[in-house]
Amino acid sequence: MLAMPSQRTAEMGEATMEDLKVTANGYDFKPAHAAMQRYVDGNLLAGISSAVLVGRDLVDVNCVGWADKEAQTPLRADHIFRIFSNTKLITSCAALLLFEEGKFQLDDPIETFIPQLANRKVLRPGASMLDDTEPARRSITIRHLLSHSAGLSYGLFDPGSVIFTAYNERKVLNPATPLSGMIDALADLPLTYQPGTSFEYSVAIDVIARLVEVISGQPFDKFIQSRILGPLGMVDTRFVVPEKDQGRLVAYYAGADLMDPMKPGLTRTDNSPYPGAYLKPVPRFNGGGGLVSTLPDTVALIRSLLPGGPTLLKPETLALLTDNQLADGVWLRFAMMGELKGKAYGLGGGLILQPSPIDHPDSQGEIYWGGVAGTQWWIAPKRNMAGVIMAQRQMAFVHPFSFEFKRLAYEAVKQAR
């Protein structure tokens, strides 16, 4: 039987605009605000909203620019964003709630629950044919899936590769099929590497969403509503924006040049990733990137993962979020960016083990992630701070604006101490 929401979540209340009132003073965020305004004035981003917490206290909330640049609609904190891969944190937390109930162990083979993923084949290094494989040396585990080390792919970021072609031909990402259909599409596709030996950003968290369905006996959207979104009061976080709220959905833009993120110019692209996205129901509850949300809702989620009050997960589970789950010597890697040395992955997001030149020096130990359109969150346990920043531009996950904001936010908190 599915457990009822815990006392921890039941005590958390509803995420409202009242929750976005600054409750601790003495922090100077004017440099961060001015920097974000420059991105808007430079026609690099239409609008940016942000919030920063020290402990559980909000020390800054800010909105600059437009929800709809063409209509000159000012961006407000209650505007709704396509959060894409920010969805992954909610999906990972959903699975970890079941883990806390003893429904599975992290190193359980996934075929215990999803038999179609047993007996995997793995592409040989340099393979140019889909059948150029070798047997997997071990099963995919739930830990591998939560940390993107299972050998799965997205079939998005490596055009021309054999796995890119296969994922697209099998329509692995097809929103017109349910999560069970995605599993069927993956069933006879090879892995890109031996489970547990590397990192590749992938549909692994969508597999986790299906795992939640199988274990709970509920559709994924119903589970997260009853166990996370409802208890946390995340009233605007869902897979489809209701018609009455569609006026609050911010416009979606593409930059002038994918390879030059600082080239001015924005083009409307509201029909991405497909016409009607987020406006009408589809069979796929995309646990890796299908939700919309708001600044208050995302702050409520992040606050629920911080010490000092009721938490969504137990303290020992929260500690797992900041434990590196990748093999020794394995770092994050993306097809268009290469290896990100010093960046690893936990059970809910990326980890900064060694800050890079574009990170603040105080960010060591930070857990973070974000969506492809520029919605990001981070938690810095060593600095007792956290933050959320939201924009809506294609391929803005690694846009300079977010790195600059985080550096300035860290500095504002540091200078106040």
Residue ranges and their predicted role:
Residues 1-16:
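Short, Lys/Arg-enriched N-terminal segments with co-localized hydrophobic residues
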Residues 22-83, 103-105, 122-127, 131, ...:
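Short, conserved catalytic-motif segment at the N-terminal edge
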Residues 30-37, 56-58, 82-110, 205-213, ...:
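Active-site SXXK
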Residues 62, 372, 376-378, 383-393:
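Short, well-ordered beta-strand elements
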Residues 111-119:
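Acidic helix-start/capping segments at beta-turn-to-alpha-helix junctions
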Residues 120-361:
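Short, surface-exposed loop or secondary-structure junction motifs
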Residues 361-367:
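Short, hydrophobic/aromatic-rich segments at coil-to-beta transitions
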Residues 393-417:
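Generic C-terminus detector
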